[in-house]
Every structure is written in C-alpha cells, then in structure tokens.
Amino acid sequence: MSTIVIFLAALLACSLLAGWLIKVRSRRRQLPWTNAFADAQTRKLTPEERSAVENYLESLTQVLQVPGPTGASAAPISLALNAESNNVMMLTHAITRYGISTDDPNKWRYYLDSVEVHLPPFWEQYINDENTVELIHTDSLPLVISLNGHTLQEYMQETRSYALQPVPSTQASIRGEESEQIELLNIRKETHEEYALSRPRGLREALLIVASFLMFFFCLITPDVFVPWLAGGALLLLGAGLWGLFAPPAKSSLREIHCLRGTPRRWGLFGENDQEQINNISLGIIDLVYPAHWQPYIAQDLGQQTDIDIYLDRHVVRQGRYLSLHDEVKNFPLQHWLRSTIIAAGSLLVLFMLLFWIPLDMPLKFTLSWMKGAQTIEATSVKQLADAGVRVGDTLRISGTGMCNIRTSGTWSAKTNSPFLPFDCSQIIWNDARSLPLPESELVNKATALTEAVNRQLHPKPEDESRVSASLRSAIQKSGMVLLDDFGDIVLKTADLCSAKDDCVRLKNALVNLGNSKDWDALVKRANAGKLDGVNVLLRPVSAESLDNLVATSTAPFITHETARAAQSLNSPAPGGFLIVSDEGSDFVDQPWPSASLYDYPPQEQWNAFQKLAQMLMHTPFNAEGIVTKIFTDANGTQHIGLHPIPDRSGLWRYLSTTLLLLTMLGSAIYNGVQAWRRYQRHRTRMMEIQAYYESCLNPQLITPSESLIE
C-alpha cells in the first residue's frame, strides 16, 4: 500500500513539475529574447515613464501612417504595451545597426547581439561602443526607453520634430552616405553544420549516459521496490544523453546570419603581426572577425566586391566562393573523440563492476538456455531421467528415493554446515542399485564391551549379578570404597581392544599397578591363565573415578576413528546413476533435523547417533526441482547434475537484465573505444586537411604537358 501511495505522490509531483516547465517554456517562447539578457537587472516602470512611452508610441503611429516618397505607406509596426511592459531591464551592451532600403523614416535596424530592438531615431548620435540601455517589453520588439542617460521624458518634443522630418531613401548601408554601401542580400538561419561548430562537444551528454549505465547496474543489486525508480531514472538519463548527442537543433537555437555584399578592406599599420592583421579587416564600419585558419586565404578578396555571411557578433562564416565553415564541417566532420572516450571508460567501469560484484555464471547460462528453448523434464525413476536427455538450461523436477551423499574432505559443497553431518542432503545419490547395509565395527563393539564392564563394576545396580555376597558388598559401600569384583575381565577386554603396544598406555599402566604385576604382558598372561579369576580390587572413590575417566579417554579415539571410517565406506556408491547437487546447498529431503550435530555428541555416543542417521538417510525420499546448470560424468559412470532453484519473475528479469547489461557494456566499450581512437587520429589531421583543401581550391596546381604523358 505504501508503495502505491509513494508512486501516486511521485506521479503528482512529476505532473506539477511538467506543467510548470511547460508554462515557463511557453512564456519564454512569447519572449524569446529574454534568455539573451539573463544577467540584466530589472526594476518597475514609473507612471511618468509609462506616460512618456505611450506618447512616443502614439506619435510613432502617426508618423508611420504618413506615405513615403514612393507613395507607399510604411509597414505597420506593432509596439503596443502589454502586461510585461511594467518590467524595465537594465544592461550594458554594444549596439549593432544595419541600413535597409525602405520608405520607413527610421531606416535603421538595431541589434543587441542577436535581438532586434526598437531605438528612437533621435538617439542614434548617442550610441557608443558600450551603451547603458533600458528596455521594456512590447508586443513585437523590445523598446529602448533610455540610452546612456537620455530618457523619453526629456526628449519627447525632440522626438516629434525628428519623426516628422522627411528622410530620403537610400540603399542599405552601415554609415549612409558617409561610408561605402553594403547590400543586405538576405537574413537566414545558420545551417546544422554551422551550428555544430558552436555546439557543445557532448561531454555533458556523455556523462549522463555513463550515469544511466551506473543506475542500470544498481538496479541489479538493489531491492525490488527501488528497481522501477532506478530503471525509470536511468532511461530518462539515457534518453536525455542520446537526445543531446543526436537530436537536430531546435529552430529557436539557430542564430541569424546576415548575408552581405560589399568590399572588405584592411585598416592597419605596417608591422602588425598575423593575428592583428586578420582582425583589422572591415566591411564598411563592421569589423569582421575571421576564423584563425583562414588567415592565409582572405587577402585575395580584399578590395573586391565579395559576398560575406556573418553572425550578429561579426564573426564570418562564409566569404567568397570557397571559404565556408559549412563546407568545412560537411567535408571534414568534427571529431568529438573525448565524449567517446568518456562513454568507453564508463562502460569499462560498469563492466568491471559486473565481473567482480555480480555472479555471472547463472545469468549467462539461463539466458543462453532461454534463447535456445529449454525444456521441462519430470522424472520419478532413474530410467526415466536417463532417457530424457537432460541439457544445461532445462528445468528439472524429479522425485524418488535415494541416499544423501557423504561429505569428504577436499570436496566442494555449497552447504558449509549441514545438520546431517557427515551426510550432505543437498547432494542426492540416485540409482537402481541395492541399498548399502548399515555400517558395523568390531572395534566399536570391543570398546563398548570394555566401557560396559567397567561401568557395571564401578556403578553396580542391585539387580546385577556379583561374585561377592550382598552383605560384603553392602559393607564395602558403607565404608566408602569401590569394589572391582571381576578385575580379570577388565584386563582381558582392555587387551582385546588395545592390542597394539602404543594403545591405551595410561590405562594399561593403571591396571598394572592395580594388579601388582611387573608389566602389562605379565598381567595379561596371568589373566589368560585364569590367575585373576576371583581377584577383587578395592578402590578409593578418587581412584575409581580416575579409572572411569581413563577408560572413557582410551576408548574415544577408537570410536571416533571407526565412525569416520564407516562414513567413508558409505562414500562408494554403485557405478552409474545420478548425483543431484544443489548449487545453493538446499536440502532435497524432508527429514527432521537431529537435536545436535554428530560431532557434538560425546565420542561414546557418536556411533549410535551415526547409525541412526545412516538408517534414516541411506534410503530416504527426496524431491529436487531447479534449472540444470552443469552436467558431467565422473570416472565411476555417475552423472552429476547441478540444479539452481527456479527463480521467480523478478529473478528471471534480473538474469536477463544482467546478461543484457553485460553484452551492452562490452559492445559499448569496444565501439566507443575504437571510435575514440579513430576520431582522435582524424582530429589531429583535420585542420591540415582543411588547409590542403583550401590550397587546392584557391591555388590549383597546373599539370605540365610532360607530367601528363603516359609512359
């Protein structure tokens, strides 16, 4: 429920944010020039200023209604005030003007960067290199209400007298009659190739793409509740990055280019360096700014009438027949090698994170099997499973009766601490062979007999038979002593168990002392000869306890060793059959866990506990289900089948997504790495190729007759 609430809240927040962005964008579309003066200060328009502006606009409308010298009325200009006109923008900027052929008394067009503004004509004389300007919004062009300290309030009378004066029509020029004429041929938008030169190199977009790769990686290791949000954010970042790299520029972002015709001239002193010479060329009063690599080729157009395309900031984009930034980008594309390097490095980073942080074996196997078309196999007998033809990637469901495998030292198991030790029920031996018998051990029987004989004599029960009278036994117990009424039996059982010379050394020494014998061999001979029959030994309680502990300590190694040996003897299944192994160590049997692990029992109890486990797990029902991850046959002919638990829907998508991300990162690293290297090599030679192209166009090499002959 909380997830749904969070989702709805996030959806509402995104909707509100999208609505606000649309509103801001629509407002900026209505005022597209606002972004050009983002650093301008603002204030409110005073009532006196508004009255002066209204009077000026009224007088301007009257002037525009007067027919020009050709008899035609001037084109109407909508300079009506609107709701945004109360905000005054104050900035310091250069003003550029162009002349046009028209009957309009105000024949000049004024620009602040790429934004055309309406400047009252009587203020032209106050234009400087840097101007303090105040603007207000109108329905069409921004209106200048103050220029370098001169305001409309002070010059309303001058405005009316100037606006009513007839102005002769001339050709378009920069300085009118005082300068050479410049013809404005056309005003166009820059081409995509010209825009590419001022477009960012795509580093920000490359970083967005790398960030989306990282978010896709984190989708694989985060809880399911966060995956949709991370995946959605990653898709948005990836889309934004790809859109920034490959989307065509918006029409509003294309700058205006003025196509002019005139005579460029160089104004400067002798002795100037190359950089100064390229920056002192003017077209009328327009100081042209050329690309640095054009410096050797612009001299031939000086003093001649030439077509020149420039931005409003006076940067030249085309001159004459051959010099063209558009043709440069078209014939010698820009090589953005750095963004390819960033994407390749980000792809390698995510690739290494996948290799070191996420197990890739199962996702790759599952994806390959899914692509090949895996089958589902169900089997209840060994023959049925053998005939099914199991392959890696198949879904396997089997049930039957088998034996839990015995874990041996040096073998790998996914389950590190099985409750059924030494049995491992995450590995099932399944075949048609007859079940193995329960393990038996003669040494364990001998150790048990010795332990029982000592316990019977040290801790007698009333119903036990004894070689001494009941009255004597009672008297001995009252005195606090302990009676061994069959000492010879203990000696014989010890000799039977501890046949080796180094076995039970401490126990043998204790029995030699109790029997007042020279050594162990002599004591055993006496016992075998029957000389110890009827010999009773009295022990103090401390000595009796010591003897009991010695017997327990001496028999423990035999029982422990025999338990391990019996377990290993079970690790020899019949040839053939199957060994079903769980990759995650899950038990395939439904048996109650023992109260304690086998090796947590005292040594004297381990054998009995082991026999109970063997009786339960050597022939036990099991159910195994999962996806086959590995199949191989060992030297014994047993087919090993590894099973991975069947993942849920979320797990399936994680497997597929892991493989897809791995392949995508590998492909991205290779492609962008190769592209970065190739683009870097081309970037190094691009400028030389452009200069060679201009050299061949402007200074063609003529082929001499001797060179054209075919030998």
Curated annotation (Swiss-Prot):
Residue ranges of the TM segments: 2-22, 205-225, 226-246, 340-360, 656-676
Molecular functions per Gene Ontology: phosphorelay response regulator activity
Cytoplasmic topology ranges: 23-204, 247-339, 677-711
Cited InterPro entries: IgaA
Annotated Gene Ontology cellular component terms: plasma membrane
Its membrane topology: Multi-pass membrane protein
Residues on Periplasmic side: 1, 361-655
UniProt keyword list: Cell inner membrane, Cell membrane, Membrane, Transmembrane, Transmembrane helix
Subcellular location: Cell inner membrane
Gene Ontology biological process terms from the UniProt entry: cellular response to cell envelope stress; regulation of phosphorelay signal transduction system
Record-linked Pfam families: IgaA
Disulfide bond residue pairs: none
Family the entry assigns: Belongs to the IgaA family.
Protein name listed in UniProt: Putative membrane protein IgaA homolog
Organism of provenance: Escherichia coli (strain K12)
